[in-house]
Amino acid sequence: MATMNTDATDKDISRFKVIFTLVVSGIECITGILGSGFITAIYGAEWARGKTLPTGDCIMLMLSFSRLLLQIWMMLENIFSLLFRIVYNQNTVYILFKVITVFLNHSNLWFAAWLKVFYCLRIANFNHPLFFLMKRKIIVLMPWLLGLSVLVSLSFSFPLSKDVFNVYVNSSIPIPSYNSTEKKYFSETNXVNLVFFYNIGIFIPLIMFILAATLLILSLKRHTLHMGSNATGSRDPSMKAHIGAIKATSYFLILYIFNAVALFLSMSNIFDTYSSWNILCKIIMAAYPXGHSIQLILGNPGLRRAWKRFQSQVPLYLKGQTL
């Protein structure tokens, strides 16, 4: 069995590293929580009023809510791993944090993948019968697909709770020069099981992303050839929709690949627990959901308008509170 082992003591992490990590990742998490919370509040309010949400908005609600949970959970894990190390390094607590983090990451990826597939089916134009069938059925099938995605994410994250992670604290490591003892934190990861369950959980949604992006590019090429040398081509709404969807998909893939690598490296214990590389992984992991939430708001005209209204109302509310 291939395993990765690390150990660390309280002396291995400086106060500067603790403060730096908490501040930087905290700013990223709070930014993401505000962005995801805003999207959740907008669509959640419409749903609470009894309105039937369009399929795209329903996916956005699921994605933003799961991402809100992910960012809150990551913030809690950073606080516990840096400030409450004895509690965090209890085997049950450590495994709980890791399993839920992977589950929320996988769920987020699935929801984002279905969002891209949905917009691909709306925007792209092909004459293939299978494409037409998917285009007609996607609205009916989407609630079932979202529920199935949660079950799949759970099925590939729950096995990580057994025979993958093992941590413990030794409180009796002697320090001869001080005639005292110090706490030492040991962690062990079964790299083979982690690689299998982690990668198989992200493989299918990543393939869906790549297929959606490929179909959009092919559809854009066909549309461009059809338009020919038409002078209004650059202002064509269909072309703008294609380009916008391709850009959004590309940005997400870049963000997610960095996040996936950082999350895997952090969980595999390749780096020492409190090394600068591990801290960098925490910062990258916090940046991904925040960055994508901002991209979703900026790329959606309705959310942009709602955000501008929100910005204009905040000063009025604060002014009223001071009177």
From Swiss-Prot:
Statement: the UniProt record of this protein carries the keyword Membrane: yes
Entry annotated with the keyword Transmembrane helix: yes
Any one cellular-component term (Gene Ontology): plasma membrane
Extracellular side: 1-14, 80-100, 163-190, 269-276
Compartments, as annotated in UniProt: Membrane
Task of the protein: Gustducin-coupled receptor implicated in the perception of bitter compounds in the oral cavity and the gastrointestinal tract. Signals through PLCB2 and the calcium-regulated cation channel TRPM5.
Source organism (scientific name): Papio hamadryas (Hamadryas baboon)
Family: Belongs to the G-protein coupled receptor T2R family.
GO molecular-function terms, A-Z: bitter taste receptor activity; G protein-coupled receptor activity
Other facts: Several bitter taste receptors are expressed in a single taste receptor cell.
Pfam families the record matches: TAS2R
Keywords: G-protein coupled receptor, Glycoprotein, Membrane, Receptor, Sensory transduction, Taste, Transducer, Transmembrane, Transmembrane helix
Cytoplasmic topological domain residue ranges: 36-58, 122-140, 212-247, 298-323
Protein's name according to its UniProt entry: Taste receptor type 2 member 40
Superkingdom of origin: Eukaryota
Stored PANTHER family: TASTE RECEPTOR TYPE 2 (PTHR11394), TASTE RECEPTOR TYPE 2 MEMBER 40 (PTHR11394:SF47)
InterPro entries: TAS2R (IPR007960)
Topological relation to the membrane, as annotated: Multi-pass membrane protein
Glycan attachment sites: 170, 179
Transmembrane segments: 15-35, 59-79, 101-121, 141-162, 191-211, 248-268, 277-297
